[in-house]
Design a protein with these regions (language model features):
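N-terminal secretory signal peptides that target proteins for export/translocation
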Residues: 1-2
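Conserved, single-site charged/polar hotspot
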Residues: 5-12, 17-411
């Protein structure tokens, strides 16, 4: 696969700690782009086509279309030729550009800083080369929601920056650092809806969360833990000393803290039989009942233990913490929490911030034995990044409907 060839790409691959560091993000990564429309909306841009440079005016429309393994460029007045790479470079540091996929069609988004386009794998790749702190702010806005306390945004900024630093080379073989899908981090364009977010990012500039060995942590988080977070090994097999279960009363007032679900009893029994439960020996439906006063690892029925995480995945439940009450024709699940339950509980952290907790107090409550440090304090040559829990992103779940109507999957 082609690699980005700008000379300034080399330094960003080596370290995230330098001032003004840029990182490269593949945009609309889930789409097989063949035509995009770009429009500068603020600042000043230069369009680079081979050895030629052209000034792009604010609101000037530019079409970029795939033509074989090259890109055809045109504006409203003329065809500007066919090129292997099209680069758009901001000149002021406060440059904003609109990107609108035409084929396939998708809503437009606004992005900061620079863009590069090239063809590979029979599609256009659109790469945003962006200042790392602007990127962090954009992800905080996408994953943390709006109208939150500044201390909560600082917590989210630390989580996002820690993940970014730990996974900087995730897509390096494909020619960029990260993509905009949730398996990297949800990136829906520039942060512009709440100035508190950018302030929080700048207040925590270059800070990350590290474990006792000063390695970046797996900064897992979820929407609501239901009153108790989960041990990492109960969800992802591997134990991590900072991802341990903690009691959390701060999320219990949230609408996401409890849920209900009814499942036809025949469907429930069919699922149980896949785990070796002899459903013919069930004499009465109440034999299926199960009470979970604390977060359970298994659902025990007829001498068989079934991982609650398996049940959650199969039935697409909001969490793996639930009790079971069987009636004549259906089983009723009464659940707690929303998400995998490991690490930071967003609803709990939001409430803590409202009650006056500081960002470092919140971080150290949910992640045990960690420290918050500047990237410049770390020994880049000895840092070890644990990638064994990379596949933490869950399938899309039913929307909780109240406080976070479009919450991203847990990370």
């Amino acid at each position: 696969m082609q690699k980005l060839t700008f000379t300034f790409i080399v330094s960003l691959i080596l370290t995230l700690g330098a001032a003004g560091q840029k990182i490269s993000i593949s945009l609309f990564n889930n789409l097989k782009l063949s035509t995009v429309l770009i429009t500068p909306t603020s600042g000043s841009y230069r369009l680079i086509l081979g050895d030629n440079e052209v000034e792009l005016k604010v609101n000037q429309i530019l079409y970029i279309s795939r033509s074989g393994d090259s890109l055809m460029v045109r504006d409203a007045n003329q065809n500007m030729g066919t090129w292997k790479r099209v680069t758009v470079v901001g000149q002021t540091g406060e440059d904003i550009i609109r990107v609108k996929p035409i084929v396939p069609a998708s809503p437009a988004r606004l992005y900061d800083d620079n863009l590069s386009f090239y063809v590979d794998l029979d599609r256009i790749f659109a790469i945003n080369l962006i200042d790392q702190e602007k990127y962090v702010a954009a992800v905080v806005e996408a994953e943390g929601g709006l109208n939150r306390e500044p201390e909560f945004y600082k917590v989210q900024a630390l989580i996002v920056r820690t993940y970014t630093f730990a996974h900087l080379n995730k897509h390096l073989a494909e020619g960029f650092n990260l993509c905009d899908e949730v398996h990297c981090q949800s990136y829906l364009g520039r942060s512009e809806k709440n100035s508190d977010i950018l302030d929080a990012v700048l207040d925590t500039k270059d800070m990350v969360i590290v474990d006792a060995e000063r390695n970046p942590i797996t900064a897992a988080f979820h929407a609501n833990c239901g009153g108790q977070t989960a041990n990492s090994e109960d969800v992802w097999v591997k134990p991590l000393p900072y991802l341990v279960s903690v009691s959390d009363r701060y999320c219990l007032g949230s609408n996401s803290s409890t849920w209900e679900r009814s499942i036809p009893i025949g469907e429930w029994k069919k699922f149980l039989s896949q785990y070796g439960v002899d459903t013919l020996k069930i004499k009465k439906n109440s034999d299926l009942d199960f009470q979970a006063k604390t977060r359970p690892k298994y659902y025990a029925v007829m001498g068989v233990e079934i991982p609650t995480t398996d049940i959650r995945k199969h039935f697409r439940l909001r969490s793996a913490w639930f009790s079971v009450s069987a009636g004549k024709s259906e089983v009723r699940l009464s659940g707690r929490g929303y998400g995998h339950g490991v690490g930071l509980c967003q609803d709990g952290a939001i409430n803590m911030a409202q009650k006056g907790w500081t960002y470092d107090q919140i971080v150290q409550y949910y992640y045990k034995g960690v420290s918050i440090v500047k990237l410049t304090e770390l020994d880049m040559d000895r840092i070890r990044v644990d990638t064994t829990l990379n596949n933490m992103v869950e399938p899309n779940l039913p929307p909780p409907g109240m406080e976070f109507p479009q919450r991203p999957p847990d990370r």
